[in-house]
């Protein structure tokens, strides 16, 4: 297995080429329990779930033919959730409600050792260090031709919330008012360390150096999330008798995405501390300009206020089921979470907060069903930009937010043939096309993916207790990129999946 990351250099995308093992393995177990009890005044429902995840990821982290550094990350993760919802049994026609409590707990034991190899030692450690040592002093060298930087973590996360929604029917209006009070706690215990032996060219023996970066961090967030919405039934005349309805709606709500810790940056932190420790032995500076502390591992919650207006027209007549909807949205965000990469030859990536951002756009959907025929289509345009974002080096205000497509288009059509035979019961054929608009990959807007189309088709044949299906994706074999990142100062793109055909069988007893 591996990761299809292509080096981008001098305006050219090079073929996927790296020399160390890259693979991913996962074991996941999920289970849940649902219960419901109805009394004289309340209906109570409860949902409990549990998830166990164990995975292992091997990574050639420089993604080049050089032997620079590799990583093996393993996780043991345990998640428990509990939600209880209360609904009144008896209520007036004009009012209804639901209230609930939610609790969530997650424990994650993670180990992510980074192994520095010969090319990585020479370029990232010795190369940078010797660049700041006068030649007459001598040259720095290491006894090891490879060594690990171990990083062990324990993450605890909990979330408790209480929420309520009330629904008011006033003539043609349906009004909703609600809130959610959310409290989250995040804890991280970390222990990163490395042991090496170094010397200057004039020294006869190597000197041991042990570097440790250990401690714990915690964060707590309390959020009040209100919500208001209104739906107006604008059906007029004989529309209801003709099986038609027309509704308009508007809503405003506040949401948030929780903060957390950047575990991927710890090898960079320890590498800088290690270089600083060696140089201090000789009374010199390390020359590092991107030295980080534990504070750099934190990022804040992202909070947004979402405004939306729209309408929906529906028709149910003579076997036809037709729905057409359109909406416009305007979202204001504070502390927008974005992925950034350390300057220079850093090996990790981290989540950071931009100042403010805004997104606005339009969306439309269509769905038609008639006998065995079905047609679906959706389209959207989005303009997502930073309003205030300065990373200390550049001002990116008014630039496009990376990874956000400027437009999307999807359409599919198919027909289901019903035979009712003893052997073949039905067959369904569907074709679809997708267009993804321009995507900017970096905050400066210098790298982008131009719009591209993909096409697909699938066939499903139903037998008693068994379905056979075959699916073709990206039938035109379009070439496009789906992800961008940087490592050791190099830029990489992840290529999209090529033309492929999948066949399978599903069984039901």
Placement of each model-derived feature along the sequence:
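Membrane-embedded beta-barrel scaffold of Gram-negative outer-membrane proteins
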Residues: 34-39, 43-49, 54-59, 238-240, ...
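Gram-negative outer-membrane beta-barrel transporters
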Residues: 92-96, 169-175, 183, 319-335, ...
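Residues on the lipid-exposed face of transmembrane beta-strands in outer-membrane beta-barrel proteins
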Residues: 31-37, 82-88, 162-168, 220, ...
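Outer-membrane beta-barrel domain signature, strongest for Gram-negative TonB-dependent receptors
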Residues: 1-98, 104-106
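Transmembrane beta-barrel strands of outer-membrane/channel proteins
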Residues: 46-50, 99-105, 177-183, 248-254, ...
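C-terminal beta-signal and adjacent terminal beta-strands/loops
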Residues: 244-245, 256, 371, 422, ...
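Solvent-exposed loop segments that connect transmembrane elements
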Residues: 1-15, 61-70, 113-150, 187-219, ...
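Surface-exposed extracellular loop regions of Gram-negative outer-membrane beta-barrel proteins
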Residues: 39-87, 153-217, 221-234, 368-381
């Amino acid at each position: 297995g591996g990761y299809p990351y292509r080096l981008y250099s001098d305006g050219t995308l090079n073929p996927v080429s790296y020399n160390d093992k890259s693979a991913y393995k996962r074991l996941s177990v999920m289970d849940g329990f649902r219960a419901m009890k109805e009394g004289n005044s309340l209906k109570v429902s409860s949902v409990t779930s549990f998830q166990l995840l164990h995975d292992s990821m091997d990574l050639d982290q420089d993604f080049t033919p050089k032997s620079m550094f590799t990583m093996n990350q393993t996780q043991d993760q345990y998640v428990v959730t509990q939600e209880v919802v209360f609904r009144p049994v008896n209520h007036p026609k004009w009012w209804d409600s639901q209230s609930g409590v939610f609790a969530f707990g997650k424990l994650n034991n993670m180990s992510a050792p980074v192994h520095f190899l010969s090319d990585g030692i020479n370029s990232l450690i010795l190369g940078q260090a010797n660049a700041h040592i006068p030649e007459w002093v001598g040259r720095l060298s290491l006894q090891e031709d490879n060594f690990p930087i171990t990083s062990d973590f324990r993450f605890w996360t909990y979330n408790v919330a209480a929420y309520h929604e009330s629904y008011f029917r006033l003539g043609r209006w349906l009004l909703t008012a609600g809130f959610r009070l959310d409290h989250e706690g995040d804890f991280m215990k970390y222990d990163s360390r490395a042991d090496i032996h170094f010397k200057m060219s004039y020294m006869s023996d190597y000197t041991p150096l042990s570097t440790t970066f250990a401690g714990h961090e915690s964060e707590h967030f309390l959020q009040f999330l209100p919500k208001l919405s209104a739906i107006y039934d604008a059906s007029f005349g004989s529309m209801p008798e003709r099986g038609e309805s027309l509704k308009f709606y508007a809503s405003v709500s506040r949401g948030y995405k929780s903060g957390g810790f950047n575990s991927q940056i710890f090898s960079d932190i320890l590498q800088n501390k290690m270089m600083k420790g060696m140089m201090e032995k000789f009374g010199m500076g390390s020359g590092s300009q991107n030295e980080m502390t534990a504070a750099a591992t934190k990022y804040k919650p992202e909070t947004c206020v979402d405004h939306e207006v729209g309408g929906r027209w529906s028709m149910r007549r003579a076997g036809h089921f037709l729905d057409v909807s359109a909406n416009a949205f305007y979202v204001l965000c504070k502390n927008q979470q974005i992925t950034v990469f350390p300057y220079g030859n850093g090996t990790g990536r981290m989540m950071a907060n931009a100042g403010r951002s805004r997104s606005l756009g339009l969306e439309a959907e269509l769905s038609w069903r008639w006998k065995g025929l079905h047609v679906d289509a959706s389209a959207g345009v989005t303009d997502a930009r930073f309003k205030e974002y300065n990373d200390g080096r550049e001002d990116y205000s008014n630039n496009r937010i990376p990874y956000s497509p400027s437009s999307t288009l999807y359409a599919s059509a198919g027909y289901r043939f019903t035979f009712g035979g003893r052997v073949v019961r039905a067959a369904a054929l569907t074709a679809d096309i997708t267009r993804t608009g321009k995507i900017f990959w970096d905050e400066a807007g210098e790298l982008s993916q131009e719009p591209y189309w993909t096409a697909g088709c699938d066939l499903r044949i139903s037998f008693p207790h068994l379905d056979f299906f075959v699916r073709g994706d990206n039938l035109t074999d379009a070439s496009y990129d789906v992800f961008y990142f940087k490592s050791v100062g190099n830029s990489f793109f992840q290529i999209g999946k090529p033309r492929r055909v999948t066949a399978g069988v599903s069984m039901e007893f």
